[in-house]
Amino acid sequence: MQIPKPNNSTWTDDQWEAIVSEGQDILVAAAAGSGKTAVLVERLIRKMTRPEHPVDVDRLLVVTFTNASAAEMKHRITEALEKELAKNPGSLHMRRQLSLMNRANISTLHSFCLQVLRTFYYEIDLDPGFRLADQTEGELLGDEVLDELFEDEYKAGKPSFFELVDRYTSDRHDLDLQWLVKRIYDFSRSHPSPEQWMRAFLSLYDVDAQTKVEELPFYPYIKEDLSLVLRSCQELLERALSLSKEPGGPAPRAENFIDDLEQVNELIRHQDDFEKLYELLPNVNFKRLKTCKGDEYDPVLLEKATDARNQAKKQLEKLKDEYFMRSPAQHLKSLAEMKPIVETLVELVIQFGERFERAKQEKSIVDFSDLEHYCLRILAEQDAEGHLIETEAAKYYQQQFEEVLVDEYQDTNLVQETILKLVSKGEHSSEGNLFMVGDVKQSIYRFRLAEPMLFLNKYKHFQPDGKETGKRIDLNKNFRSRSDVLDSTNFLFKQLMGETVGEIEYDEQAELKLGASYPESKDTTTEMLLVHLDQQEAETGEEREELETVQFEARIIAKKIKELVEQPFQVYDAKQQMTRNLQYRDIVILLRSMPWAPQMMEELKKQGIPVYANLSSGYFEATEVSVILSLLKVIDNPYQDIPLAAVLRSPLVHLDENELALIRTSDKKGTYYDAVKAFMSVTHSDHPTCKKLERFFQLLRKWRDFSINHSVAELIWEVYRDTQYLDYVGGMPGGKQRQANLRALYDRAKQYEKAAFRGLFRFLRFIERMQERGDDLGAAKTFSETEDVVRMMTIHSSKGLEFPVVFTVGLGRNFNMMDLNQSYLLDKELGFGSKYIHPELRISYATLPLVAMKKKMRKELLSEELRVLYVALTRAKEKLFLVGSVKNQVKALSKWQNAATGEEWLLPDFERYQSKTYLDFIGPALIRHQAMSSVLEETGDVVLSHPSTFTISFTQASDLLKEDMSLEKKEQDEIVQALMDGLPVEGYGDADEKVAERLSWKYPYLAASQVGTKQSVSEIKRMKEIQDEYSVPSSIRKARATLYDRPAFMKKKTLTAAEQGTAMHTVMQHIPLPSEEPYDESRIGHLLDSLQQRDLLTDEQVQSINQEGIAAFFSTSIGQKLLKADWVKREVSFSMVLPVKEVYSHIDTEGEPVLIQGMIDCLFETDGKLYLLDYKTDRVQGRYTGGIDAAVPILKKRYETQIALYAKAVERLTNRTLEEKILYFFDGNVEISL
């Protein structure tokens, strides 16, 4: 019977139920900010302090995710016990609980496993004096074992091993295969029975002549993907058809859409039959679209319908490429061929595991993975069928623990789940005692092999009433955030999180409910800040400064932070129960990962925003550390060019770049060490460079001898002493930190040798391993929580934290999906999927298991990214900012509108499955919010009714460039202004003359500085036009006929002139030449159809092609020569170096070169004569008042520089003289010989 909640209790009913319920396994689904830690602590305290049957604290097992969480929980419990003791000082029970706290089993699961090993080591013949190895030590030992294993296999000479090597290694080394063995071994350790799991995945390749693809274990994931894509194509084509029936829609194309839709429906009817799909899909043919020209067709509807059809077409093409490039029989044959290869691989991994374990036992060490697996061996044995049978040790813990409580249960893996079951009573008792707390929506550690499905399966199986199952309790009241934050989060995730993508429905139970009480505020609306990056030239023609996306976002964040602080924004202090002004420390900036952090910090600091981020990297890049590491590499092996050059250039030897170059001239082909020896042998000993080298090599010989009989740590200290380098760096800026860095390297060498490793080479390999993993020896920066600065951290680091104001940034960055592109994948359920690799032909392609895993893992990755986004949004207490960048505002809004179809709350599965960024998730969801009316010309078809409030704004990147808010810039402006006003500048003394001299100084090579060292021919042409009388705007306007633009509302959306030009060049590039047959409009039309089928041209580009102009070109004299050419080369790229004066006659600089790059449209030879042809799509007809005759001299002058440079390049390349250089303008069929 449940204990009733006291009348004066502040706990909610659901929280109270979680505190007092018992008698069965309990799962508490605790949403963000629902007070789960407080509930867990209260449950523990009540168990220890209840009047009847109190529980001693050492009879409870509490498993936390981190050591910090365990320490915090111990502290909270101790405080609560002390308060209880203060109320009743005579309580012996309270005193006993406090005395037992040092024995309390409140720890991470790894710590508990370590305790089990210390207690029952004898059950598995483990050395009681074992120690825990760090990760790097374990990896080095594993590398040694693997090297020995491969050496033995090579000696044994088994054909199966050599075939494995042939398929999974490069021509140069077998490191790829070694890495694969380690990868499978490490991955298998997340399964309770690694060997059993590896042998099980061989069933993926267990096929014969009677096997059907549909029968294989991975097929359900292929079937799901096929269904997802085909349904998406169906929806897209139905949308296109619907648009064609609207007023102004592309009605003639309805016939196309109906035909396309019928083909897709036929595929859907057979989507469960892989063989039938293989027959049907290659025959799907989207015919050429009907022409829709004229003002009666709405260009917007036309574009939307065409885009929908093109999307469907591309999806079907991708489906064909992924699954149906080979017949089902060929796919099965590939799997059958791979089975013996995979069997050999599995046996190799098992051998490695056995040898690795023996090697660790010999050294009496265990690694973190061993802790769990050894604990599992102590708690359970396997029977003949692989089932786990609990041991006496497991029964001991079942009797020992009254209850097992697990925090952050959503982040456990299968091994940990098995251990928890073995020490709890749930499997063998009607009164389960496993209490699990977590939130699957915050499961963000799949990359560490956490398994959120464990939580989800229980969530679906357990019931709120607990009858015949475990009990499920939902804590969905949020006591952290204002309603604006909760409503915004709910609005987004009701549309984004579902079973297919998200792995859980964001239903009423999952929604966040308001639990916190805040005073009213008008400024807490969630803000979406978007940067429009499309950087076109300003109207003035001046090119804008190029800034990276991170800098743009940093500037918009800085602007907002300044506004918040200057207003000032009011935040509520719950402890003081009062509102106060916002401080910098109330703000956090959350990033998905830290690569952006250094640049963002730098930009924010420039804008005057105090900011802190724990950038715990850069130790190995520190100059003083990299110099010593390079020196150690040279001591180990001087035949390493880069380390040797680094040491010679460093303060240890002090050679400059000229001396290094001089040394290389002594031996240009050998190693740099050979060059040094050669230089010293031919150079007089009194030469300054030779003296430096001689001193260094005397020390080097000494150190190499010293390293033979001494430890690495002793060698490092000897180097410090001989070079006095430790003292030297102490005198540099930041000297104390530099000395500390060098001492840390010495200390690490001592630790390395304590682990029974020896030798300089192995130590250097050990350091390389640390660098590869991103480990860092640098101490974390000391930082006070009270320091008034903006925090910057990853979303993962923010989990469990809360801040009044949160900026979630970088929402336009692509998700990291690199792992999905590997040649093989590993999955807990499906096992091992690999490309098929033919050893002789050296061809490879994805097998069906690999494709199935890729699809499965993509959905899992996207689900994880959704959960990461949920964590980010739920950190905010009072105000939330979402910050991202798009390349083009119009295209982004159009894309989001197309994705936000249907009236269901949940966005279509396929649209969410296609997401590559957080904006791909958020954009379509926000499109359906009423707030989007502020940025849309017309709102979408569906606007969802919801209490959430958003403000959405786009900022042009150009505006952020104009607002250079840098403090340094402001200071410079102030100084310049003071000088212009004749006012004294503080801090500069009587330096009037020097200031005047500097301000009046002119750079003598100004003209040369305006020319880049590398330029394209087009850039040179534009530079010439600036000085060209024919290109002065006023002159052009005089020559051109007056044309009037249509009003904007009458314009159709068409391809730009540049896009039309690109399309025309694509056609001319792919016309078969030379040709005996003439090119008329009919033949050109067939060519366009072919180019469209091959996706080289879009429908819009085909419509824009001047077919009549191309046909007319081939009837000209130059066109005829081209048809009869001996050979034709098109799109000929070149690079050549010319003196700058030869390109720009107004620049007097002698000897300065400029690298010129360009692309020649067409070069051909006819009757032994060489011709250069450049075709243009410029508008000519009707543009010049004097007609074509007036246009020719202007066009000649405009393009003469370009053609002259092309001619010079051709003559250099071929060593021949051009017969003729021709410009051809398709508009007007104008041929100009230059």
UniProtKB/Swiss-Prot annotation:
The keyword Isomerase applies. ATP binds at residues 30-37. Its EC number is 3.1.-.-, 5.6.2.4. Residues 9-482 form the UvrD-like helicase ATP-binding domain. Keywords: ATP-binding, DNA damage, DNA repair, DNA-binding, Exonuclease, Helicase, Hydrolase, Isomerase, Nuclease, Nucleotide-binding. One of its GO terms (biological process) is double-strand break repair via homologous recombination. It catalyses: Couples ATP hydrolysis with the unwinding of duplex DNA by translocating in the 3'-5' direction; ATP + H2O = ADP + phosphate + H(+). GO terms for cellular component: cytosol; DNA helicase complex. The keyword Nucleotide-binding applies. Residues 509-800 form the UvrD-like helicase C-terminal domain. It comes from the Bacteria. Its cofactor is Mg(2+). SUPFAM superfamilies: P-loop containing nucleoside triphosphate hydrolases, Restriction endonuclease-like. Heterodimer of AddA and AddB/RexB. Belongs to the helicase family. AddA subfamily. The heterodimer acts as both an ATP-dependent DNA helicase and an ATP-dependent, dual-direction single-stranded exonuclease. Recognizes the chi site generating a DNA molecule suitable for the initiation of homologous recombination. The AddA nuclease domain is required for chi fragment generation; this subunit has the helicase and 3' -> 5' nuclease activities. This is ATP-dependent helicase/nuclease subunit A.
